[in-house]
Amino acid sequence: MFWRRLRPGAQDLAPKGLPGDGDFRRSSDPRLPKLTPPALRAALGARGSGDWRIPGGGAAWWPEGDAKPGVGVGRLPPRLPALLTATRRAVRKRGLLRSLLPPPLLSAGASRESAPRQPGPGERERPRRRVAREDPDFLGAFLGELLPSRFREFLHQLQEKCAEEPEPLTSPAPQHQRGVLEHCPGSPRCPNCSFLPDLWGQSSHLQDSLTKISLQQTPILGPLKGDHSQFTTVRKANHRPHGAQVPRLKAALTHNPSGEGSRPCRQRCPFRVRFADETLQDTTLRYWERRRSVQQSVIVNQKAALPVASERVFGSVGKRLESLPKALYPGAKEETLASSSCWDCAGLSTQKTQGYLSEDTSMNSSLPFCSWKKAAAQRPRSSLRAFLDPHRNLEQESLLPNRVLQSVLKQGCPKGYHLLLASATLQPDKR
């Protein structure tokens, strides 16, 4: 093979051959010398006892004298580390949290003094990992410079809470009843209040409304099942039709002297029934809907009673007209009966009634009594039941002629009749 001649003074480089050549073996790194098993075991043991440790477990994973699992024959199986208890785990977490929290706030001069010392000209700067390990507050100080002041105050408060003694893990009362028992208004430790709604965190307006409801509903609910300490006895008397004096309702509170079964918190519950999957807002809404329906039913009953009362009033007027003396006029009673019989028919409009009233007034002023009687006999008798209203009773009184009304007033009638016919006496003055 032809080789080019090198210049004088140039560096002589060995030619690179193929991977299988011997030149490649000479150019590669020299291998480490092979160690015997006893020497290897000694080296690994020295490294395990020194800096080489398993995080979290340390050298406790393997028995003393063992370098690694699989080295040596006939060794004991590896031992697992002991499980951490709840208290050790809490202490470990607390220590980790303290290392993450920033140090307390200091002034500018103090912060400069507490800052890590700068290495001198002859000293060597330590790596950051070793600084963080030796100084646990390094990370906290670094975070304190970056975080805002409010968040630092929150972290300080959290650090103070962590510094306090830990609460006992076991408590006599279950955790789901603890929140209810702490805020129970009656007694601080009442095991019978678990069904009450937890009002902690609710708005003040809702709490005030619930207290008002409880005060209103406590005497109405009466004795609850299984509560023998406080109960209300109410005696109700039947209504007597002959006007006998009805005795008043009497309520007497009797207390049980033995004191067994005392449940002071149950009477403050505003609701008798609360479902398991129902929230406090749903219970309140259901209660108010029920109360609203009761109020609406009372209003409807009052409206339905108004026409009944008007019918009673006009029925009494008809009876008084029937009781008029026959000696006044021979046809007066017939006319009053004819006018009263028109109330039991159906279908009379407002325009027709006004026309009839105008006919009555014109006839009373111009025609004699006999012509008015004939016109009244020819008049169709239709209903005034649609106008049986307390505001229209004065218009219905004008159906009678003025002469008959004046004669009735002269003879003398009951006081109530004067009041009903007062408008009829004022009509001639207006004309």
UniProtKB/Swiss-Prot annotation:
Protein localization: Cytoplasm
InterPro entries (UniProt xref): DUF4685
Transmembrane spans: none
Phylogenetic classification of the source organism: Eukaryota, Metazoa, Chordata, Craniata, Vertebrata
GO cellular component, one term: cytoplasm
Originating gene: C9orf50
This protein's name: Uncharacterized protein C9orf50
UniProt key word Membrane: no
Source organism of the structure: Homo sapiens
Skewed-composition ranges (Low complexity): 106-121
